[in-house]
Protein backbone atom coordinates (compact mmCIF):
# COMPACT_ATOMS: atom_id res chain seq x y z
CA UNK A 1 0.00 0.00 0.00
CA UNK A 2 1.30 3.43 -0.92
CA UNK A 3 0.97 6.18 1.67
CA UNK A 4 -0.67 9.37 0.39
CA UNK A 5 1.68 12.32 -0.17
CA UNK A 6 0.01 14.42 2.55
CA UNK A 7 0.47 11.64 5.14
CA UNK A 8 4.11 11.16 4.10
CA UNK A 9 4.71 14.92 4.40
CA UNK A 10 3.11 14.92 7.86
CA UNK A 11 5.40 12.06 8.94
CA UNK A 12 8.45 13.96 7.69
CA UNK A 13 7.45 17.19 9.44
CA UNK A 14 6.54 15.46 12.71
CA UNK A 15 9.85 13.56 12.66
CA UNK A 16 11.78 16.81 12.35
CA UNK A 17 9.74 18.84 14.83
CA UNK A 18 9.61 16.11 17.49
CA UNK A 19 13.30 15.19 17.09
CA UNK A 20 14.89 14.57 20.48
CA UNK A 21 11.59 14.45 22.38
CA UNK A 22 10.77 11.37 24.46
CA UNK A 23 7.53 9.74 25.61
CA UNK A 24 6.75 9.64 29.32
CA UNK A 25 7.67 6.19 30.64
CA UNK A 26 9.24 5.17 33.94
CA UNK A 27 11.74 2.68 32.48
CA UNK A 28 12.02 2.92 28.71
CA UNK A 29 13.28 5.70 26.47
CA UNK A 30 10.69 5.86 23.71
CA UNK A 31 11.13 8.45 20.94
CA UNK A 32 8.14 10.80 20.94
CA UNK A 33 7.44 10.20 17.25
CA UNK A 34 5.95 6.82 18.23
CA UNK A 35 2.89 8.65 19.61
CA UNK A 36 1.98 10.72 16.51
CA UNK A 37 2.55 7.65 14.32
CA UNK A 38 0.14 5.67 16.53
CA UNK A 39 -2.44 8.46 16.30
CA UNK A 40 -2.13 8.57 12.51
CA UNK A 41 -2.42 4.78 12.28
CA UNK A 42 -5.54 4.75 14.46
CA UNK A 43 -7.15 7.41 12.28
CA UNK A 44 -6.22 5.60 9.08
CA UNK A 45 -7.59 2.33 10.51
CA UNK A 46 -11.07 3.87 10.82
CA UNK A 47 -10.99 5.35 7.31
CA UNK A 48 -10.30 8.99 8.16
CA UNK A 49 -9.48 11.23 5.17
CA UNK A 50 -5.81 11.94 4.42
CA UNK A 51 -5.89 15.48 5.84
CA UNK A 52 -7.30 14.13 9.13
CA UNK A 53 -4.62 11.41 9.31
CA UNK A 54 -2.00 14.09 8.59
CA UNK A 55 -3.42 16.37 11.29
CA UNK A 56 -3.39 13.43 13.70
CA UNK A 57 0.29 12.87 13.01
CA UNK A 58 0.96 16.58 13.53
CA UNK A 59 -1.49 17.06 16.42
CA UNK A 60 1.14 18.04 19.01
CA UNK A 61 3.45 20.29 16.98
CA UNK A 62 1.74 23.58 17.86
CA UNK A 63 1.41 22.64 21.52
CA UNK A 64 4.81 20.99 22.07
CA UNK A 65 7.19 22.20 19.35
CA UNK A 66 6.52 25.92 19.05
CA UNK A 67 5.23 25.63 15.49
CA UNK A 68 2.61 28.27 14.63
CA UNK A 69 -0.57 27.55 12.70
CA UNK A 70 0.74 29.77 9.88
CA UNK A 71 4.05 27.88 9.70
CA UNK A 72 2.19 24.59 9.69
CA UNK A 73 -0.17 25.81 6.95
CA UNK A 74 2.81 26.82 4.81
CA UNK A 75 4.47 23.45 5.40
CA UNK A 76 1.43 21.28 4.63
CA UNK A 77 -1.90 23.14 4.11
CA UNK A 78 -4.41 25.37 5.90
CA UNK A 79 -7.10 22.71 6.43
CA UNK A 80 -4.67 20.37 8.19
CA UNK A 81 -3.17 23.23 10.22
CA UNK A 82 -6.65 24.35 11.32
CA UNK A 83 -7.41 20.86 12.66
CA UNK A 84 -4.13 20.82 14.59
CA UNK A 85 -5.06 24.18 16.12
CA UNK A 86 -8.47 22.80 17.13
CA UNK A 87 -6.85 19.98 19.12
CA UNK A 88 -4.11 22.11 20.71
CA UNK A 89 -4.34 23.26 24.31
CA UNK A 90 -3.87 26.98 25.05
CA UNK A 91 -0.15 27.70 25.46
CA UNK A 92 -0.60 30.74 27.68
CA UNK A 93 -2.20 28.92 30.66
CA UNK A 94 0.47 27.30 32.84
CA UNK A 95 -1.74 25.82 35.58
CA UNK A 96 -2.63 22.20 34.62
CA UNK A 97 -6.26 22.29 35.79
CA UNK A 98 -7.03 25.72 34.33
CA UNK A 99 -5.45 24.73 31.00
CA UNK A 100 -7.48 21.51 30.86
CA UNK A 101 -10.70 23.35 31.77
CA UNK A 102 -10.10 25.94 29.03
CA UNK A 103 -9.34 23.19 26.54
CA UNK A 104 -12.55 21.34 27.40
CA UNK A 105 -14.51 24.50 26.57
CA UNK A 106 -12.82 24.77 23.16
CA UNK A 107 -13.17 21.02 22.56
CA UNK A 108 -16.93 21.30 23.13
CA UNK A 109 -17.04 23.55 20.03
CA UNK A 110 -14.60 21.49 17.92
CA UNK A 111 -15.38 19.90 14.57
CA UNK A 112 -16.14 16.19 14.32
CA UNK A 113 -12.81 15.65 12.56
CA UNK A 114 -10.96 17.37 15.41
CA UNK A 115 -12.85 15.24 17.94
CA UNK A 116 -11.84 12.09 16.06
CA UNK A 117 -8.19 13.21 16.22
CA UNK A 118 -8.49 13.94 19.94
CA UNK A 119 -10.07 10.52 20.46
CA UNK A 120 -7.16 8.79 18.69
CA UNK A 121 -4.72 10.91 20.72
CA UNK A 122 -6.35 9.84 23.97
CA UNK A 123 -6.49 6.18 22.90
CA UNK A 124 -2.73 6.30 22.34
CA UNK A 125 -2.14 8.12 25.63
CA UNK A 126 -4.38 5.75 27.61
CA UNK A 127 -2.50 2.77 26.17
CA UNK A 128 0.77 4.40 27.25
CA UNK A 129 -0.60 5.06 30.73
CA UNK A 130 -1.66 1.42 31.10
CA UNK A 131 1.73 0.15 29.92
CA UNK A 132 3.67 2.59 32.11
CA UNK A 133 1.57 1.61 35.14
CA UNK A 134 2.93 -1.93 34.86
CA UNK A 135 6.41 -0.55 35.47
CA UNK A 136 5.53 2.05 38.10
CA UNK A 137 2.50 2.31 40.39
CA UNK A 138 3.18 6.05 40.72
CA UNK A 139 2.56 6.63 37.03
CA UNK A 140 -0.01 9.40 37.51
CA UNK A 141 2.54 12.08 38.31
CA UNK A 142 4.28 11.50 34.99
CA UNK A 143 1.12 12.26 33.05
CA UNK A 144 0.17 15.57 34.66
CA UNK A 145 -2.14 16.20 37.56
CA UNK A 146 -2.97 13.68 40.22
CA UNK A 147 -4.98 10.50 39.63
CA UNK A 148 -8.34 12.05 40.52
CA UNK A 149 -7.92 15.11 38.29
CA UNK A 150 -6.38 13.17 35.40
CA UNK A 151 -9.21 10.63 35.46
CA UNK A 152 -11.83 13.38 35.66
CA UNK A 153 -10.25 15.08 32.65
CA UNK A 154 -10.07 11.85 30.63
CA UNK A 155 -13.71 11.08 31.42
CA UNK A 156 -14.77 14.63 30.47
CA UNK A 157 -12.95 14.40 27.12
CA UNK A 158 -14.56 11.03 26.43
CA UNK A 159 -17.99 12.40 27.37
CA UNK A 160 -17.66 15.26 24.87
CA UNK A 161 -16.41 12.97 22.12
CA UNK A 162 -19.02 10.22 22.52
CA UNK A 163 -21.86 12.77 22.35
CA UNK A 164 -20.71 14.08 18.97
CA UNK A 165 -19.07 11.31 16.95
CA UNK A 166 -19.61 7.66 16.13
CA UNK A 167 -16.43 5.66 15.59
CA UNK A 168 -14.89 2.38 16.74
CA UNK A 169 -12.23 4.59 18.36
CA UNK A 170 -14.83 5.93 20.81
CA UNK A 171 -15.60 2.39 21.99
CA UNK A 172 -11.88 1.66 22.27
CA UNK A 173 -11.41 4.84 24.30
CA UNK A 174 -14.22 3.73 26.66
CA UNK A 175 -12.66 0.28 27.05
CA UNK A 176 -9.24 1.75 27.86
CA UNK A 177 -10.79 4.23 30.31
CA UNK A 178 -12.41 1.32 32.15
CA UNK A 179 -8.96 -0.25 32.54
CA UNK A 180 -7.35 3.03 33.60
CA UNK A 181 -9.89 3.57 36.38
CA UNK A 182 -8.57 0.36 37.98
CA UNK A 183 -4.97 1.58 38.12
Residue ranges and their predicted role:
Residues 1-183:
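Active-site helical microenvironments for divalent-metal-assisted chemistry
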Amino acid sequence: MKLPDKVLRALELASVWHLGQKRKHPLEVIPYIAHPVQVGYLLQSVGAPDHVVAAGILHDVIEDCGVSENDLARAIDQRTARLVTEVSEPKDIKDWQKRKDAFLVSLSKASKQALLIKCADHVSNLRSLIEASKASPDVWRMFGGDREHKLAYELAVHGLIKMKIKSPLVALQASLLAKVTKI
